[in-house]
Structures are given as structure tokens and as C-alpha cells.
Amino acid sequence: MGKYFDVSYMIQAFPQLLNYVHVTVLITVISAILGVMLGSIIAIIRLKKVPVLNQLFIVFISFMRGTPFLVQLFLIYFGVPEIMSHMGLNMRNVPGLVFVYAVFTLHIAAYSAEIMRSSIDAVAPGEKEAAKSLGMTEFQSYVRIILPQAFTMSIPPLTNLVIGMLKGT
């Protein structure tokens, strides 16, 4: 097994890898924050069944959850600049890291949308009725009562999602 796995090379390369840990952490943190925010908005739109947006987000979520991450990365990195060039926009000089942030954010948004949708559905209907009986608007009831409980319930699956994303970077 000596010619397939060289421990001395691994020990030599490890300090070089440590120089880039901050990039991995930065990609993970920024994409997780933006992805969960976008996913929460998508979840609310899906729950409210906004006519056109609901169908678009169903397709978006199915695509993002059903295709391998590497395929998504290739499609965004090579496809978006090509499409934009036909529209007269030159995206050839955009740094590759921008596309990495975009793909990770969209990927996390798709998964977190389903997590948040199920978490919001899990909040007891009586909580929503109580907020309405107190005279709260729908926005107030979401911000003050429903979303805090939903976020509490979604912490374990969101943590798993972020850990998986960290490993994926």
C-alpha cells in the first residue's frame, strides 16, 4: 500500500491546506446565511401558494435537490456567462468565487426551503389563531410567533445541512 498512500506527502501538504481553511469557512458561513434567508422566503411563498411563484419554486427545489452539486456548479459557472453573452452582458471577467457563492447559496436555499416549510407547518394552528385573536397582522404573527418557533424546530436539520455544505467545500 506504500505506493498508493504516502504519509510523508500528506504531512508535507497539510500546512499548505491550512492556508485555505478561511476560504472554506467563509464560503460556508456566507452561503449558509444567505441560503437560509432565501429558503425561508421561498418556504413562506410555498405555504401561501402564490400562484406563479409557487410553481416556479417547486421546479427550482426539485432541480436543486435532484441534480448533483457538481453539475449545478458547472451549469452556473459555464452556462450563465454564455446565456448572458447572448443578452449583451460580458460575465467572462467575473471571479469564479462569485459563482461558487451563488451555487452554494441556491443549493442551501432549496434544501432549507423544505426544512423551513415543514417547520412552519409544524407550528400548532392554535398559535396562529391566538396571534390573530390578539389583533396581530399576519406579518406580525409570523415575525413574533410562528418563525421563532419554526427556527427552533429547524435547528437540527439546518445544522446537518451546514455541516454537509462545509464538507462539500
Q: What does each of the following model-derived ranges do?
A:
Residues 1-169:
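Transmembrane alpha-helices and adjacent helix-loop boundaries
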